[in-house]
């Protein structure tokens, strides 16, 4: 009928309008990220530095804790133990220290008030900020994967599970960082230096990631060390499954909490 056709047309137009707004939000976020050299450099630094560290570690011969004991390991256990070191640095520098997420609100500065007048739910604005942070992180994860495959001569069995875990933890930590910045943003800065160099708060998630990374690296070393007493393939598989599940749980809990409290924290932000 004509009424049904009009309803479908209206629904289609609403979808197109929302899609256009999301695209505009995404482009605005990209421009906001790269409008200042300091913000841009610090935001993408982790994605560039981490894969370089992976390559440097290989050439200087940095050994995993298990290798340092001189214990002979199978190729799977040896690769698993070595990947633990890469996983640690990637969690700390790539996931925990992503300024794209840690300064998602703060870098708005005096333009923050514009967000109050954008005709979309604030939840969509937060989703966009997380998407941009994810984009930066995921580029770094792909580069780490490529670097790791290169230096390990194609150790797919160990590198690919690590890569999948890094995708999960990048999203989880980006959500944590955006939520933390929403709760305590600095939007009254006059120079980016104030929120980048003289602000310890955005660096805190890096220490969360460092703690997780150390714990994971120790567990991986123990699994590799005692491979003769366990089924190493099963041990490696269970480790990565458990690690990824933990990351998913963290991401879900943070995003559910953020969804409930985002508007409250958004409303109380003042630009002086």
Name the predicted role of every residue range.
Residues 1-113, 122-272:
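Hydrophobic alpha-helical transmembrane segments of membrane proteins
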């Amino acid at each position: 009928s004509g009424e049904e056709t009009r309803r479908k047309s209206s629904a289609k137009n609403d979808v197109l309008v929302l899609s256009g707004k999301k695209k505009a939000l995404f482009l605005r976020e990209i421009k906001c990220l790269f409008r200042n050299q300091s913000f841009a450099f610090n935001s993408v630094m982790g994605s560039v530095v981490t894969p370089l560290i992976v390559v440097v570690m290989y050439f200087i011969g940095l050994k995993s804790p298990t290798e340092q004991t001189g214990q002979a390991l199978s190729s799977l256990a040896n690769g698993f133990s070595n990947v633990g070191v890469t996983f640690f640095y990637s969690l700390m520098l790539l996931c925990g220290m992503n300024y794209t997420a840690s300064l998602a609100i703060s870098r708005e500065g005096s333009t923050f008030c514009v967000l109050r007048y954008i005709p979309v739910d604030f939840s969509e604005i937060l989703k966009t900020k997380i998407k941009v942070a994810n984009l930066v992180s995921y580029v770094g994860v792909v580069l780490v994967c490529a670097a790791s495959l290169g230096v390990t001569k194609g150790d797919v069995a160990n590198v690919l599970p690590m890569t999948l875990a890094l995708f999960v933890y990048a999203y989880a930590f980006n959500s944590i960082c955006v939520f933390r910045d929403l709760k305590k943003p600095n939007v009254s800065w006059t120079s980016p230096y104030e929120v980048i160099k003289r602000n310890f708060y955005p660096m805190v998630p890096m220490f969360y990631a460092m703690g997780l990374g150390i714990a994971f690296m120790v567990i991986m070393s123990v699994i590799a060390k005692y491979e003769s007493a366990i089924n190493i393939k099963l041990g490696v598989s269970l480790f990565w499954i458990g690690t990824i599940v933990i990351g998913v749980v963290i991401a879900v809990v943070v995003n559910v909490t953020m969804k409930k409290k985002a508007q409250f924290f958004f409303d109380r932000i003042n630009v002086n």
